[in-house]
A protein has these predicted regions:
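Motif-centric detector for short Cys/His coordination patterns
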Residues: 1-85
Length: 85
């Protein structure tokens, strides 16, 4: 059977490196992007707190700015720590 890809239905920036995310399977968690900001040139723009604050749900994942920066929902699902943990 083909497993359904998880999608992000809600995303809210918490601070300058973390986003609260909700998935369509009911899971909610916090995605810490600090390692991405530090290690990945593609995410360098997110080091600007005002740009990071544009985080929102879109296209089934978390997007920033005009949508040209995103994070794969399956990666977010794997890395998000449960809310309240």
């Amino acid at each position: 059977s083909v497993s359904k890809l998880v999608e992000i239905t809600d995303a809210v920036p918490l601070d300058s490196s973390r986003v609260a995310v909700r998935f369509d399977d009911g899971y909610s968690g916090v995605l810490d992007m600090s390692a991405y900001l530090r290690d990945w040139p593609a995410y360098r723009k997110l080091r600007d707190p005002s740009f990071f604050a544009t985080a929102r749900a879109g296209l089934g994942t978390v997007i920033w700015g005009d949508g040209s920066i995103d994070v794969a929902p399956e990666v977010a699902r794997e890395e998000a720590t449960p809310l309240g943990a």
